[in-house]
From Swiss-Prot:
Protein name: Anaerobic nitric oxide reductase flavorubredoxin
Domain Flavodoxin-like residue range list: 254-393
Binding, Fe cation 1: 79, 81, 147, 166
Cofactor: Fe cation; FMN
One GO MF term attached to the UniProt entry: nitric oxide reductase activity
UniProt keyword list: Cytoplasm, Electron transport, Flavoprotein, FMN, Iron, Metal-binding, Oxidoreductase, Transport
InterPro entries: Anaer_NO_rdtase_flvorubredoxin (IPR023957), Flavodoxin/NO_synth (IPR008254), Flavoprotein-like_sf (IPR029039), Metallo-B-lactamas (IPR001279), ODP_dom (IPR045761), RibonucZ/Hydroxyglut_hydro (IPR036866), Rubredoxin-like_dom (IPR024934), Rubredoxin-O_OxRdtase (IPR016440)
Pathway it works in: Nitrogen metabolism; nitric oxide reduction
Organism: Salmonella choleraesuis (strain SC-B67)
Rubredoxin-like domain ranges (all copies): 423-474
Organism superkingdom: Bacteria
Length: 479
């Protein structure tokens, strides 16, 4: 099945609803993907890219239903990766002499994958053109390391369509092809996820390359990507976002992620987040347990954040393996303009937090002081965690924060509280958190002045998330 893109340009690609892993298992494609191939029929017939190798036979069969394969005059390969050029072997078996236009680096990559040096390769460079008839040309622009050395884009004059390769794409599968037809929230979430996890290491190249392309002074009516939607409605909006994301992007956001063996490091993470929120309630704080969270969502949040707090238990004197792996990925992504702090719990010996701090610094983060706790944090240790969060909130603030002062209740209010018999304070037997009836627990809609007997049965301890049955009367108040 083909879809009309514009005039004599048709999409002849392949949707992949089921794919959930990309680049091995390193990128989770939770919304599937598509492999976009385009057929141009002017006086010359041109095929731009193919599809993933697992769809090779299906792709060639579908293409044959659109055009006699022998009538294809040129094949353009913007990128040699297997999800772009994977069907070349199947296709070239039918039309072995058809010229393949690509960069010099692409020849090496294509031969490395397909092992056919006898194919009719034509090397192109930035500014080279190919006449396709009817007064139209293809103009080639090399884009090395966006995101492979062989990458290039192809611009079609007349119709003003930029075939942008991986740039401006997203792993997003939908029955509809164009950006104005799909769910906008989903689309832009996947665009940012794609940039954060794939293109971030090359951000320093994005702005000059976009500037170079704009320097050709060519109109762009559509951007036809290699994955996801074709941008036809205000196509330059995604270009503007790329320029923004490439400029050491950050939001007023802090990401906390951790791994834990006995919930101790999780308790620290929660307390740190509480401290941040006390001082700066406007900053967005997201907490992830790496053992239970989508790794690419965590990395996307790190990309969006001004800073990250990373927590780990100590195991065999080193950090937890999932934390080590994720920090290694952050090193490769080369995030810029971000701060970091390490924290974690240990038992008879430590080592993980110091090792983690060193790794984060090596990854390019500006480091703040780390925080350690021995065994399960008690009330004093949890208060130190909250104070650490307060300190971090002030150190990482994008603008000066107002000083907070402890509000003193009016005398008559104090008298009323003392006079009222609210019952004893209750202490969680697992994490030692204390419920004070005078303060309640506003985050769970338990108002100040609520005795324990009136607290709803679905109440959960804010520190360890266990229910009311693990609470006992505070020892100092037990009679």
């Amino acid at each position: 099945m083909s879809i009309l893109v514009k005039n004599n340009i048709h999409w002849v690609g392949q949707r992949d609803w089921e794919v959930r892993d990309f680049h091995g298992t390193e990128y989770k494609t939770l919304r599937g993907s598509s492999y976009n191939s385009y057929l141009i029929r002017e006086e010359k017939n041109v095929l731009i890219d193919t599809v993933d190798h697992k769809f090779s036979r299906e792709f060639v069969q579908n293409l044959r239903s659109e055009i006699d394969l022998a009538d294809i005059d040129y094949i353009i390969i913007n990128h040699a990766e297997e999800d772009h050029a994977g069907a070349l072997t199947e296709l070239m078996a039918q039309i072995p002499d058809t010229p393949i236009y690509c960069t010099a680096n692409a020849i090496d990559s294509i031969n490395g994958h397909h092992h056919h040096p006898e194919w009719n390769f034509k090397v192109v460079k930035t500014g080279d053109t190919l006449d396709i008839g009817n007064g139209k040309q293809l103009i080639f622009v090399e884009t090395p390391m966006l995101h492979w050395p062989d990458s290039m884009m192809t611009y079609m004059t007349g119709d003003a369509v930029l075939f942008s390769n991986d740039a401006f794409g997203q792993h997003y599968c939908d029955e509809r092809l164009f950006n104005d037809e799909v769910d906008q929230t989903e689309l832009f979430e996947q665009c940012q996820r794609y940039y954060a996890n794939i293109l971030t290491p090359f951000s320093r190249l994005v702005t000059p390359k976009i500037t170079e392309i704009l320097g050709f002074n060519l109109p762009v009516d559509m951007i036809a990507t290699s994955h996801g939607v074709v941008w036809r409605d205000n196509p330059t909006q995604i270009v503007e976002l790329y320029l923004k994301w490439a400029a050491d992007y950050q939001e007023d956001r802090i990401t906390i992620f951790y791994d834990t063996m006995s919930n101790n490091t999780r308790m620290m993470a929660d307390a740190i987040a509480q401290g941040i929120n006390e001082v700066d309630p406007n900053v967005a704080v997201k907490i992830f347990n790496v053992a239970r969270s989508d790794k690419n969502e965590i990395l996307t949040n790190v990309f969006r954040s001004k800073g990250v707090l990373v927590g780990t238990s100590t195991m065999n004197n080193v950090m937890m393996p999932k934390i080590a792996g994720l920090v290694e990925e952050m090193t490769g992504l080369r995030f810029r303009n971000k701060r970091a702090s390490a924290f974690g719990s240990h038992g008879w010996s430590g080592g993980a937090v110091d090792r983690l701090s060193t790794r984060l610094q090596d990854a390019g983060f500006e480091m703040s002081l780390s925080l350690k706790a021995k065994w399960r944090p008690d009330l004093d240790a949890l208060e130190l965690c909250r104070q650490h969060g307060r300190d971090i909130a002030r150190q990482w603030a994008l603008a000066p924060l107002p000083e907070t002062t402890q509000k003193t209740a009016p005398a008559e209010e104090i008298t009323t509280c003392v006079a009222a018999d609210l019952g004893p304070k209750m202490q969680c037997s697992v994490c030692q958190w204390i419920y004070d009836p005078a303060q309640g627990e506003p985050l769970q809609d338990v108002a100040p002045g609520t005795p324990w007997s009136d607290v709803p049965d679905n109440f959960l301890c804010p520190e360890c998330s266990l229910g009311k049955d693990v609470f006992d009367v505070l020892a100092t108040e037990a009679k």
